[in-house]
């Protein structure tokens, strides 16, 4: 296999309502990838996040993010009009997501959908609840309680709730019954739309790469129901938990990326059943889970990031001439700057090294020269954020800002992905044998 991919969070897609969704704009992005002869779309985690809105902070590893639900189908069903939606406050900045405003407006709209449709006789909703009973009930209860406690961390809920007192939970189930059903219904809507999007991607020859964090956050359903969910002490228990997570990921993605970060070191591991068995992958994850920061690089020896090949902490394995045919290589990770922004931050000596490596010192050529250098490597898959194809600067990075509130807020401007850009990417893919369905 020799192919290429684009990193683009769904939440960053263009939208008239403050945040990208699973609807028409996601399908349009798939159309763009297909026309560019790109066959992997890395979407970032799609989980229901905590109040930080970071995609790495999942309330539940299996629950989809309600903010990504497309509202157009409910306009078509007459629940509300486009004009009613446009009157809501989704935030005025077309270049950044205002999560507080988007969340308030989106949940107001989704409550209208629930009031109109959530209690109608619907065998498909009943079937969804039955098929997902192993996680859905706990998740919906947890989400309702999290809202009840005004999004405070789990340890501040009180011992009775935090330790799952039967009496306390029974009382809350009665008190929050309607809200619990609301959160169940949102998952039904989310996964209905997700299934449609995945089928569309498959039709276009685009494989979806999803990702999940190695450690689950403290305020999550998994740690609430199983405090040992992050434990790596016992091999068999660890493997059982991860096999369940991988089985779920196979229902959602074609390729799954597992991410772990310790101090300044980070590692990715990739799961696709034709590449590696679940047993072998769980063994790799166990090594990653037990590794110290200094050992992570060895555990993730097949993953590379161009930007990490330069500077004071440079590692030669990140340079494209070292990539082998099993490698999965990135321009940079989601916490790194864009190419243009990164080069501007380099000291003179390091910048000269980069320019000599990519063969140009001209700012207008640097981003595409880095991409070209990556694309001609031996790596099996090379991936770049869409921002680098667009040659955008630091303000368009996904995360790593000094102010954490600016993380995960970047939005793609509608009309940025032109036919000319698609043709340029397609030419590069064909030139370096990364085109065609894999």
Predicted regions and their residues:
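Flexible, glycine/threonine-enriched loop-and-boundary segments that flank and lead into catalytic domains
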Residues: 192-203, 237-244, 251, 305-318
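Conserved alpha/beta catalytic core and glycan-binding cleft of carbohydrate-active enzymes
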Residues: 124, 263-394
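Substrate-binding/active-site clefts of carbohydrate-active enzymes
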Residues: 199, 205-250, 263, 270, ...
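Short, acidic/polar
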Residues: 20-32, 238-248, 367-369
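Acidic/aromatic-lined carbohydrate-recognition and catalytic surfaces
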Residues: 1-226
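Structural preference for beta-strand elements that scaffold enzyme active sites
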Residues: 3-7, 40, 205-209, 213, ...
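Structured C-terminal cap/extension of enzyme domains
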Residues: 392-438
């Amino acid at each position: 296999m020799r192919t290429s991919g684009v990193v683009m969070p769904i939440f960053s897609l263009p939208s008239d309502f403050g945040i990208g969704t699973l609807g028409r704009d996601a399908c349009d992005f798939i159309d763009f990838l297909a026309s560019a002869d790109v066959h992997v779309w890395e979407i970032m985690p799609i989980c229901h996040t905590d109040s930080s809105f970071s995609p790495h902070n999942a309330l539940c590893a299996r629950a989809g993010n309600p903010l990504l639900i497309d509202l157009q189908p409910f306009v078509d069903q007459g629940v509300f009009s486009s004009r009613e939606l446009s009157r809501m406050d989704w935030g005025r900045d077309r270049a950044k997501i205002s999560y507080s405003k988007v969340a308030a407006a989106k949940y107001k709209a989704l409550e209208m959908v629930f009031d109109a449709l959530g209690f109608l006789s619907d065998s498909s909703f009943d079937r969804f609840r039955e098929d997902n009973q192993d996680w859905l009930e706990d998740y919906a209860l947890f989400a309702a309680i999290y809202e009840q406690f005004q999004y405070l961390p789990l340890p501040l809920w009180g011992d009775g709730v935090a330790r799952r007192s039967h009496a306390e939970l029974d009382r809350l189930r009665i008190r929050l019954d309607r809200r619990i059903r609301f959160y169940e219904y949102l998952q039904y809507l989310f996964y209905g739309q997700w299934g449609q999007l995945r089928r569309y991607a498959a039709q276009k020859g685009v494989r979806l790469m999803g990702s999940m964090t190695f450690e689950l956050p403290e305020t999550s359903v998994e740690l609430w129901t199983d405090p040992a969910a992050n434990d790596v002490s016992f091999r068999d228990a660890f493997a059982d938990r991860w096999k369940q997570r991988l089985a779920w990921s196979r229902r959602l993605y074609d390729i799954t990326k597992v991410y772990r970060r310790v101090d300044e070191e980070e590692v990715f591991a990739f799961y696709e059943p034709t590449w590696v068995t679940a047993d072998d992958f769980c063994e790799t994850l166990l090594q990653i889970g037990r590794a110290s920061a200094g050992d992570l690089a060895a555990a993730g020896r097949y993953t590379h990031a161009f930007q990490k090949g330069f500077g004071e902490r440079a590692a030669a394995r990140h340079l494209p001439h070292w990539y082998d045919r099993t490698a999965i290589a990135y321009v940079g990770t989601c916490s790194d700057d864009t190419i243009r922004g990164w080069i501007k931050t380099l000291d003179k000596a390091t910048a000269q090294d980069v320019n000599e490596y990519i063969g140009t010192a001209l700012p207008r050529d640097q981003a595409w020269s880095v991409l070209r250098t990556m694309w001609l490597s031996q790596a099996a898959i090379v991936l770049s954020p869409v921002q680098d194809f667009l040659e955008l600067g630091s303000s368009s990075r996904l995360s790593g800002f000094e102010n954490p509130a600016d993380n995960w807020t970047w939005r793609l401007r509608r009309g940025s992905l032109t036919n000319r850009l698609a043709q340029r990417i397609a030419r590069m893919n064909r030139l370096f044998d990364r085109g065609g369905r894999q």
